[in-house]
């Protein structure tokens, strides 16, 4: 007997509701033209890595808990004397989410993490890059439920980039609004 395959809630919502809403609004000639989420890239830069080389490893462990996937340690491409950074020195961590993990992270981000951000007034609707990708920053990684507040010795910021197959910012903005992204008015 075949077991039912797990499908994330937001992916199911995209297939059943969001695709139809996008088709009605933009009237695409082909259903393959309807924009969809491509990937989510989470980057955590660790500026204190110059003083303590263990910091990027700690940040990577927190990022792994948040994303549910092992991150890659990013290294400096060239030396910068002013920042005391040497070439190939670990300076952060990043992870690329696709598929089910991407939809699960998006669900937690929109419904749990963003409402917990202090003084949150909504996402900047101008943070699109002109090609349908949205970038945002979070100053404290403790807004995610996977991070235990009592065990955190230092708070890290992170960049979150949501890449879509949309060709214009308007299409991407509509897609993310359908995924209930809280944009500022």
Curated annotation (Swiss-Prot):
GO biological process: translation
Keyword annotations from UniProtKB, A to Z: Ribonucleoprotein, Ribosomal protein, RNA-binding, rRNA-binding, tRNA-binding
GO cellular component, one term: ribonucleoprotein complex
A Pfam family: Ribosomal_L5
Keyword Repeat among UniProt keywords: no
GO MF annotations in UniProt: rRNA binding; structural constituent of ribosome; tRNA binding
Xref: InterPro entries: Ribosomal_uL5, Ribosomal_uL5_bac-type, Ribosomal_uL5_C, Ribosomal_uL5_CS, Ribosomal_uL5_dom_sf, Ribosomal_uL5_N
HAMAP family noted in UniProt: Ribosomal_uL5_B
Family in the record: Belongs to the universal ribosomal protein uL5 family.
Assembly and oligomerization: Part of the 50S ribosomal subunit; part of the 5S rRNA/L5/L18/L25 subcomplex. Contacts the 5S rRNA and the P site tRNA. Forms a bridge to the 30S subunit in the 70S ribosome.
PANTHER family: 60S RIBOSOMAL PROTEIN L11-RELATED
Function per UniProt: This is one of the proteins that bind and probably mediate the attachment of the 5S RNA into the large ribosomal subunit, where it forms part of the central protuberance. In the 70S ribosome it contacts protein S13 of the 30S subunit (bridge B1b), connecting the 2 subunits; this bridge is implicated in subunit movement. Contacts the P site tRNA; the 5S rRNA and some of its associated proteins might help stabilize positioning of ribosome-bound tRNAs.
Name of this chain's protein: Large ribosomal subunit protein uL5
Organism from which the protein derives: Rhizobium etli (strain ATCC 51251 / DSM 11541 / JCM 21823 / NBRC 15573 / CFN 42)
Lineage, uppermost ranks: Bacteria, Pseudomonadati, Pseudomonadota, Alphaproteobacteria, Hyphomicrobiales
